[in-house]
């Protein structure tokens, strides 16, 4: 593996462990020339999955698009990068188990919203406000009422 610091092609594995709920192997490596330590990840290459967009066009599934959307929605919220990564893993696992080669962007958006509703209500509202393209304040108010009902039912169920 090429060292990102000096470009030398030989490195040794210092530590290796499972990551991302067992779907990835994380390796700590050390460059044999300069001693720089760096991390690499080994992940199973999945078959290509196409996303059918709202306009009917198709593009390859990108977990990075989901990641970026969630990160943007979770800014300045108490949501860890591990929480986000686990959220994306659950979404991707569900998509790959239920859809063979194509899935609609609407389905993906709904799965993201379901995960965010459990993770953090504010992050959920931020994501929904972009994803749902609200036309007026009444639509946002309706969403907030749904969240409020869910939060209250959770609190009353845990008492």
From Swiss-Prot:
A zinc finger (unnamed) spans 3-34. Keywords: ATP-binding, DNA-binding, Metal-binding, Nucleotide-binding, Repressor, Transcription, Transcription regulation, Zinc, Zinc-finger. One of its GO terms (molecular function) is zinc ion binding. Binds 1 zinc ion. Residues 49-139 form the ATP-cone domain. GO terms for biological process: negative regulation of DNA-templated transcription. Its cofactor is Zn(2+). Pfam families: ATP-cone, Zn_ribbon_NrdR. The keyword Cell inner membrane does not apply. Belongs to the NrdR family. Negatively regulates transcription of bacterial ribonucleotide reductase nrd genes and operons by binding to NrdR-boxes. HAMAP family: NrdR. This is Transcriptional repressor NrdR. It comes from Streptococcus agalactiae serotype V (strain ATCC BAA-611 / 2603 V/R). The lineage of its organism: Bacteria, Bacillati, Bacillota, Bacilli, Lactobacillales.
């Amino acid at each position: 593996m090429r060292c990102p610091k000096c470009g030398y092609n030989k490195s040794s594995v210092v530590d290796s462990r499972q990551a991302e709920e067992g779907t990835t192997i994380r390796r700590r490596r050390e460059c044999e020339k300069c001693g720089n330590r760096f991390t690499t990840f080994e992940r199973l290459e999945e078959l290509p999955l196409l996303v059918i967009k709202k306009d009917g066009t198709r593009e390859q599934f990108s977990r990075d698009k989901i990641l970026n959307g969630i990160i943007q929605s979770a800014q300045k919220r108490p949501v860890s990068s591990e929480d986000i990564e686990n959220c994306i893993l659950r979404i991707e696992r569900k998509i790959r188990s239920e859809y063979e080669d194509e899935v609609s962007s609407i389905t993906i958006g709904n799965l993201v919203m379901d995960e965010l509703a459990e993770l953090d209500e504010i992050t959920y509202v931020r994501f929904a406000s972009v994803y749902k393209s609200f036309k007026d304040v009444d639509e946002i108010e309706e969403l907030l009422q749904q969240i409020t009902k869910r939060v209250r039912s959770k609190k009353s169920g845990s008492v």
